[in-house]
Curated annotation (Swiss-Prot):
UniProt record similarity statement: Belongs to the AAA ATPase family.
Coiled-coil parts of chain: 13-89
Gene Ontology terms: biological process: modification-dependent protein catabolic process; proteasomal protein catabolic process
Domain of life: Bacteria
Chain residues that bind ATP: G289, C290, G291, K292, T293, L294
Region (Docks into pockets in the proteasome alpha-ring): 601-602
HAMAP family in the cross-refs: ARC_ATPase (MF_02112)
Cellular compartments per GO CC: proteasome complex
Protein name: Proteasome-associated ATPase
Keywords: ATP-binding, Chaperone, Coiled coil, Nucleotide-binding, Proteasome
Keyword Acetylation attributed: no
Record's subunit section: Homohexamer. Assembles into a hexameric ring structure that caps the 20S proteasome core. Strongly interacts with the prokaryotic ubiquitin-like protein Pup through a hydrophobic interface; the interacting region of ARC lies in its N-terminal coiled-coil domain. There is one Pup binding site per ARC hexamer ring. Upon ATP-binding, the C-terminus of ARC interacts with the alpha-rings of the proteasome core, possibly by binding to the intersubunit pockets.
């Protein structure tokens, strides 16, 4: 027990009495121990002594409880005093750090005023960063350093000024203002650049025009770059893993696009020697499911590897950029947003291509956003979207190391200004596969490593390669045979001519893949039902029948001319379609009642 506690404890009546009794007992004990002979009254004295000791013990226990109670009360009083002091403190203010001075003072923006204040001794001014939030006491002294502001207004970066610390931003009402850049937005090595260095070297490398910045307009600071989710979702920056060897039946088209895209990048010196301008864009058009998107992906993959070989790099680390633009998702209901997205996409392409790396901008379903102006087919959005694309392709800035590839199955709906030479120079039609091309496509999906039924293998002496080849030949012969089972449609043209079309006239690479997938599924079901493992020719033939049966209802007999354009049958206008699939009723055929519905196509 401390002296203070002892004094407080002895200040109570019980403590004083305990101390008096303790002294009395001690005196009596000394008398008893000092007497040489004990008289008859000694036993009574001993009894009184024991009673006194018991009373002392009781009082000691009581005194200990009182001491504990006093200690607890003291702690509660101290806690209440601290709480009262805390509640009585004046409020603290917050401000934005603007600059640190050499005399350990700082400039802050607080309550709408710019002030120079002092810092608490426990604040290291060297660790403070511009744009940081600081806490001020009632004397306007910095007592705590906080984080950077995480809420505010969103402004668009127009440009970074030459000093590298300020930027021109545009607000929602197109109001331009100059703001300071917080330290996180400045290049990490900015502090290592000498003051007499060129201003261009001081520009933050992480910022680019068009970025969205979090801005405190009152303090005049930009704190953070906000990712633009709407553009990130539309663009896929990666090299696809599709090669030309994965594409079947399109050898001629592949050669055309390699001449248009790869030659200018791989042989720039020859193009310059002959004063030949590389094409700026390629249009891949044709019926759906015939490999337009697949070719565009293979171009990016092949170009990246060829450029890596040309530079002497490892082809496995080949680098190029394939910006896959989802056409329909570009459209935005707000005026000017679609055009802004297109500007940002080409701005990103220019940045990626600035170091000589090839960049491919691929617009899938191009007709959905770049339709002919003034047709009335859709809204008037194309009147501003099309000129934006035209200005990006061959505007003042120009495109270096950037190739635009568009894919569409309705090239007749794309604005003619986009298709003229100098923009999308090369136009490659992706035809429907013929019998030879179909065999090539089947060979990509029916490979020798697939399990083949033992009976089919036995027919060819156990040679797996010959068995697979025979499977492909038989299924192609069945698919392309001009027999009654393969009759699909009878079309009537405007001049009265009629023509019978077979399923082979509407075949595509996607349909072939679907046939093989059906056959594989049938083979799996056979294993589960019969226990016999392996793919059979009959599985493929049954899959063809099922695939044809699913497609028999697909022709649009309400608007046959429109359907014919999508399906790839162009030429004389079609006015009547009659399905010839067995079991179909004659009611499936339908003529065109009026020509008004076809006015936009004539």
């Amino acid at each position: 027990m401390s002296e203070s506690e002892r004094s407080e404890a002895f200040g109570t009546p019980d403590a004083a009495e305990v101390e008096r009794l303790r002294r009395e007992v001690a005196a009596l004990r000394e008398q008893l121990e000092g007497s040489a002979a004990r008289g008859p009254g000694d036993s009574g004295r001993l009894r009184d002594l024991n009673q006194l000791e018991a009373r002392i013990d009781s009082l000691n226990a009581r005194n200990a409880k009182l001491m504990d109670t006093l200690k607890e009360a003291r702690q509660q009083l101290l806690a209440l005093r601290e709480e009262v002091d805390r509640l009585g403190q004046p409020p603290s203010g917050y401000g934005v750090l603007l600059a640190v001075q050499t005399d350990e003072t700082v400039d802050v923006f607080t309550s709408g005023r710019k002030m120079r204040v002092t810092c608490s001794p426990n604040i290291e001014t060297s660790e403070l960063r511009r744009g940081q939030t600081v806490r001020l006491n009632e004397a306007l002294t910095v007592v705590e350093a906080g984080n950077f502001e995480s809420v505010g207004e969103i402004s668009t970066l127009r440009e970074v000024l030459d000093d590298g610390h300020r930027a021109l931003v545009v607000g929602h009402a197109d109001e331009e203002r100059i703001v300071w850049l917080a330290d996180p937005l400045i290049a990490p090595d900015l502090s290592e650049v000498s003051e007499d260095a060129d201003g261009a070297d001081l520009k933050p490398r992480k910022l680019r025009p068009g970025d969205s910045l979090l801005v405190d307009t009152k303090a005049g600071y930009a704190f953070e770059r906000i990712p633009k989710a709407e553009v990130e979702d539309l663009v896929l920056e990666e090299v696809p893993d599709v090669s030309y060897s994965d594409i079947g039946g399109l050898a001629r088209q592949i050669e055309q696009i390699r001449d248009a895209v790869e030659l200018p990048f791989l042989h720039k010196d020859l193009y310059q020697e002959y004063s030949l301008r590389p094409p700026k864009g390629v249009l891949l058009y044709g019926p759906p499911g015939c490999g337009k998107t697949l070719i565009a992906k293979a171009v990016a993959n092949s170009l990246a590897k060829k450029m890596a070989e040309l530079r002497g790099d490892d082809s496995r680390e080949a680098k190029s950029y394939f910006l896959n633009i989802k056409g329909p998702e570009l459209l935005n209901k707000f005026v000017g947003e679609t055009e802004r997205h297109i500007r940002l996409i080409f701005q990103r392409a220019r940045e990626k291509a600035s170091d000589g790396t090839p960049v491919i901008v691929f617009f899938d379903e191009m007709d959905s956003i770049f339709r002919t102006r003034g047709t009335g087919v859709s809204s008037d959005v194309e009147t501003t979207v099309v000129p934006q694309l035209l200005s990006e392709i061959d505007g003042v800035e120009g495109l270096e190391n950037v190739i635009v590839i568009g894919a569409s199955n309705r090239e007749d709906m794309i604005d003619p200004a986009i298709l003229r030479p100098g923009r999308l120079d090369v136009k490659i039609k992706i035809e429907r596969p013929d019998a030879e091309s179909a065999q090539d496509i089947f060979s990509k999906y029916l490979t020798v490593d697939l399990p083949v039924h033992s009976e089919d293998l036995a027919e060819f002496g156990g040679d797996r390669g010959l068995t697979v080849k025979a499977m492909i030949e038989k299924v192609v012969d069945r698919m392309y045979a001009e027999i009654d089972d393969n009759r699909f449609l009878e079309v009537t043209y405007a001049n009265g001519d009629k023509e019978v079309m077979y399923f082979k006239d509407f075949n595509s690479g996607a349909m072939i893949q679907n046939v093989v997938d059906r056959a594989k599924k049938n083979a799996i079901k056979s294993v589960l039902e019969t226990g016999q493992k392996g793919l059979r020719i009959q599985h493929l033939l049954d899959s063809i029948v099922d695939e044809f049966a699913e497609n028999e209802d697909l022709p649009n007999t309400t608007n046959p001319d429109d359907w014919a354009r999508i399906s790839g049958k162009k030429g004389e206008r079609i006015v009547y379609i009659r399905t010839l699939v067995t079991g179909k009723s004659s009611s499936a055929s339908r003529a065109i009642d009026t020509e008004s519905s076809l006015g936009q196509y004539l």
